[in-house]
Amino acid sequence: MGRGNRHSVTKIYYTDDIGFILPAKTLILTRFMITKPTSYKPISGNDLPRFAGIATFMRLPYVAPADADEVEIGLIGVPWDGGTTNRAGARHGPRQIRDLSTMARNVHHASGIKPFELCRCADLGDTPVNPVDIEDTLGRIQAFYNEVVNQGIVPLSAGGDHLITLPVMRALCRAQPVGMVHFDAHTDTLDRYFGESKYTHGTPFRRAIEEGLLDPKRTVQIGIRGALYSDRDKEWGLEQGIRVIEIEEYNDLGVDAVIAEARRVVGAGPTYISFDVDVLDPVYAPGTGTPEIGGITTYDAQLLIRGLRGLNLIGADVVEVSPPFDMSGNTALVAVTLMFEILCVLAEAASAES
């Protein structure tokens, strides 16, 4: 083509591998006019290098929630850490997790599950947030998830601090309280911080129980450890009926027995998975807001998630990745790997239900 040709053309390949011939100056506009992909498969690292392209969760197509009526599992970022009381930075978690998720592939090596064959999956983008107003942000996040839930999409979220789970549950658990498998170093059932603050990353599950979103008798917390402010930090949840497996009991029981106990507690009812990366020993996940030594290993975490296959799962999150404290990127890579583990379990459950 001549240098002076104003109508020179460029061939561009989208995630569906269909090429479009368009005037070069219209490429950007046209890209954002496309609302639905023709394929919900991720881009292969054999077709586009992992360091190239625009980062989406697991290299899936981006679909706005308003256009996501075909999507069955939506991966969502919640870039907010306004509930953090110690080391901030989890607001940057979704971006870093997206970047590292280029390492994800299509087939689970142990189970053989192919989540992208079982379900239509997409990156639904980030929720809107207000970094200077907690309650406004909670409302914005809930409104985003209301749209997701109303379309029957199963959400898999990346935080963000652990307070983000509360507005997700407000959208997801409106019909009835649900059970939960909660991996964490902390119970997150405190009442208030600094006398007045009801909404922090240490209070979401107390609020969820009070609001009738979470059934404490169908809730199991795994990996709890670390010093307390007072005895009441632990006692309130136990009084509500939460099954708390502290790290000492975890080590005594072993992974298989912990899985069996978790399955017994949640039963056959609708169940949510919430995974705080600080359940892991900081050797494996240093990039988090409230690290506690003596945690579980990454391999144990993988086995625990695989042990939830067959449950009635309605959604999940992975939270508290703080990139400013994750110099090597290992914590984000761990989060990506665990999100893929959870995605496989969710996809199997969703496909069985359909």
Predicted regions and their residues:
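Active-site histidine-anchored catalytic micro-motif
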Residues: 139-140, 145-146, 150-218, 222
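Short helix/loop capping segments that flank catalytic or ligand/cofactor-binding pockets
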Residues: 84-86, 191, 230
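Short, structured patches in soluble enzyme cores that scaffold and shape functional sites
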Residues: 182-185, 221-226, 246-248, 320
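N-terminal amphipathic/basic-hydrophobic helices that include classical n-h-c signal peptides
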Residues: 1-32
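Glycine-rich phosphate/diphosphate-binding loop of Rossmann-like nucleotide-binding domains
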Residues: 225-229, 233-237
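Active-site environment of divalent metal-dependent phosphoester hydrolases
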Residues: 189-190, 227-229, 323-325
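Catalytic cores of soluble, metal-dependent hydrolases
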Residues: 32-80, 86-156, 163-175, 236-239, ...
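Residues at secondary-structure transition points
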Residues: 8-12, 23-25, 165-166, 208, ...
